[in-house]
Amino acid sequence: MSKVIGIDLGTTNSAVSVMDGGEAKVITNPEGNRTTPSVVSFKNGERIVGDAAKRQVVTNPNSAVSVKRLIGTGEKVTLEGKDYTPEEISAMILGYMKSYAEDYLGEKVTKAVITVPAYFNDAQRQATKDAGKIAGLEVERIINEPTAAALAFGIDKTDKEEKVLVFDLGGGTFDVSILELADGTFEVLSTAGDNKLGGDDFDNIVVDYLVDIFKKENGIDLSSDKMAMQRLKEAAEKAKKDLSSTVNASISLPFISAGENGPLHLETTLSRAKFEEMTKSLVERTMVPVRQALKDAGLTKNDIHQVLLVGGSTRIPAVVEAVKNDLGKEPNKSVNPDEVVAMGAAIQGGVISGDGKDVLLLDVTPLSLGIETMGGVMTVLIERNTTIPTSKSQVFSTAADNQPAVDINVLQGERPMAKDNKSLGLFKLDGIAPAKRGIPQIEVTFDIDVNGIVNVSAMDKGTNKKQSITISNSSGLSDEEIERMVREAEENASEDLRLKEEAELKNRAEQFIHQIDESLASEDSPVDDAQKEEVTKLRDELQAAMDNNDFETLKEKLDQLEQAAQAMSQAMYEQQAGQAEVDASSSDETVVDAEFEEKN
């Protein structure tokens, strides 16, 4: 079987790796670099990808950066007057990596495993697959970045049972995942993150600092000079990297601008202490998702066996120190953090092509999935952080007599009421045979495959008529949005519980009124007029309370009506039982001695 390459398609930088001689090997690009900037530029119709594009990103307005943030959203990028989808731009980056992987391998590459953030929803995962297809790649598997990282770190450690926290601070995004490693299985227990936090933010703080000191010294604002800003950006990134191994970084930018007396230069030294002081708030922000991930997994820091550092920004000493202090463990830095995700993808590619050890990857769904049911309630079928692939079915019924169709509103979120969650799609199952409410059996099934793609179907078990929907056009949910939804669910828990209880109370009352109406309408009902009058009065009072949303009275009247109905049922039972005895005694002789009689 041909080689399956592993690609880390990053927000800021990307990398490609392949299994070679039983090990994952990162492939260098034509410029000799092991990572490739995720940047595409156009200049006079010429397409430029990678390092060359990054070098002109500030000066060339026809440059696309961080398109990963847009993937799956339907937004477009305009370059030299032409609109491109994020998938098309991503495909250009993938195609570039595919080409230099082919040069290295000396053969055509058609298959790949591509990684995505753990928080990517269905639309974003599908869009990533589409980007691969545009680039001429058959995407064998989409896997979560932290899962890929754990593969690269843990492929030889699968005989141990460990809980691992993956701390992934890249150029543009931040993800935390907690995984359990046991018996060749990697299971994601929880995920959290911040999609607006990364190495770029550290660079930007240094750029602002340099702009500020130059303005104070020379009275010139460099922020309006594109060429100067390009050089400042490159100098800031270099200084940040230098400060990972030294305590002082020299910044020298000759001829950065010009004043009345001639050219001006920027010469300064940035200390690690000053850098850490300026970026302290960013480092502190990384700890919030760490605590959230532990909380979601139901763990404490003492339950974590290993902390894995992923992403180039984890080389920043203050970040390493914060992780160590917060989790009480020395982080594992044994694999290059820039390359570890691509290597993990290559390992999974090796498993697919038969060139590697078989490892089972079990990712999770980041938010609960369900449907809207009577009363505007969200009924959850698949809980948040459920391991995928998974399938879950539940039988529902109609809410009204002779209902010909049901609308299935597919929801994602953590709130009890449907309106507070995100609707992923809506479809209709019609052709339901006429029947009283509650009789038809509608089986709703949620299927999530290994790539996190959701398929929802509804089948009328009476007619076997079926409708389904694949969720592929929902707008993307960012880490921030998911965190917000989870946070809102926690903050509104008591109010949500009240609303859900009220909705359930109304549903119960409505069903009971329906049953009472059927009983009272029965012509052969043995209930006396006094009982009927009492039950009818309570039924009307219950209906009025329901119409007025008077839930205190509703609960009181429902309890009273249930007691009255029980008394009515008991009377009906006793009367029917007494009648049955009379019928039985009067028919005993007939039963024993009867003969059929033919009448002319």
Swiss-Prot record:
Which GO molecular function annotation, any one, does this entry have? unfolded protein binding
The record's annotation in SUPFAM superfamilies points to: Actin-like ATPase domain, Heat shock protein 70kD (HSP70), C-terminal subdomain, Heat shock protein 70kD (HSP70), peptide-binding domain
**Composition bias, Polar residues:** 569-589
Instruction: Spell out which residues are annotated as carrying Phosphothreonine.
Output: 173
Q: Where is the composition biased (Acidic residues)?
A: 590-600
Q: Has keyword Cytoplasm?
A: no
Keywords for this protein: ATP-binding, Chaperone, Nucleotide-binding, Phosphoprotein, Stress response
- Description of what induces expression: By stress conditions e.g. heat shock.
Instruction: Report if keyword Endoplasmic reticulum is assigned.
Output: no
Domain of life (superkingdom): Bacteria
Please give the residue ranges the record annotates as the region Disordered: 569-600
Q: Which InterPro entries match?
A: ATPase_NBD (IPR043129), Chaperone_DnaK (IPR012725), Heat_shock_70_CS (IPR018181), HSP70_C_sf (IPR029048), HSP70_peptide-bd_sf (IPR029047), Hsp_70_fam (IPR013126)
Record's family?
Answer: Belongs to the heat shock protein 70 family.
Q: Which HAMAP family match?
A: DnaK (MF_00332)
The record describes the protein's role as:
Acts as a chaperone.
Q: What is this protein called?
A: Chaperone protein DnaK
Look up and give the organism this protein is from: Erysipelothrix rhusiopathiae
